[in-house]
Curated annotation (Swiss-Prot):
This is Ribosome maturation factor RimM. It comes from the Bacteria. Coiled coil: none annotated. The gene is rimM. One of its GO terms (molecular function) is ribosome binding. It comes from Sulfurovum sp. (strain NBC37-1). Binds ribosomal protein uS19. GO terms for cellular component: cytoplasm; ribosome. Belongs to the RimM family. Residues 95-174 form the PRC barrel domain.
Length: 178
């Protein structure tokens, strides 16, 4: 059974047609372009699409059943999605890397103190920021309800996916200055 699109991750958008053979511009919204390979299938707002050709140098993609310019035009502005299992299978991580969906929902601790819970991750320029919903006990003392912490070694000590805890240092200073 196919998952609803809202349970999947938006990974790319299809642009205009290029040439006469059904090539389309590919606009990536993922950190893992290597997941796009001939034969891989992805969900879209137009149903399942299977890659028949991909050219990263030109930034183009072609799908099975859409090998003419007229057929391919129907896919302009189509969004491509991958589910969690597909993402984990096709996107190998290096040591110390984590998928955003594994970090969102983690508690954020500085030493023994609970600062809050990661409710989103935002990318500003080339840096990922943990958007943290501040713990109620800290909000009650007059601190902000939300704050951002750069996901860099300066602030993040480690992320324990099994325990769902992000250990940080100096993040409370950011919270207090927010």
């Amino acid at each position: 059974m196919q998952k609803p699109i809202n349970e999947n991750f938006f990974i790319a958008q299809i642009g205009r047609t290029v040439g006469l053979w059904g090539d389309l511009k590919l606009h990536l919204h993922t950190d893992f372009p290597e997941q796009f390979k001939v034969g891989n299938s992805y969900q879209s707002n137009r149903g399942e699409l299977t890659i028949s050709d991909i050219n990263f140098k030109r930034g183009t993609i072609r799908f099975q059943g859409y090998e003419s310019i007229d057929a391919a035009k129907k896919l302009t502005n189509t969004k491509l999605y991958a589910d969690e299992a597909q993402t984990k299978e096709q996107c190998p991580l290096e040591e110390g890397q984590h998928f955003w969906f594994n970090v969102i929902g983690c508690t954020v601790n500085q030493g023994d103190e609970l600062l809050g819970v990661v409710d989103d991750i935002q990318r500003l320029a080339d840096v990922d920021y943990l958007s943290i919903k501040t713990d109620k006990a800290l909000v009650d003392t007059g601190l902000p309800k939300n704050f951002l912490v750069p996901y860099i070694d300066r602030y993040v000590i480690n992320t324990d996916e099994k325990s769902k805890i992000v250990h940080v240092k100096d993040a409370k200073d950011i919270l207090e200055a927010s």
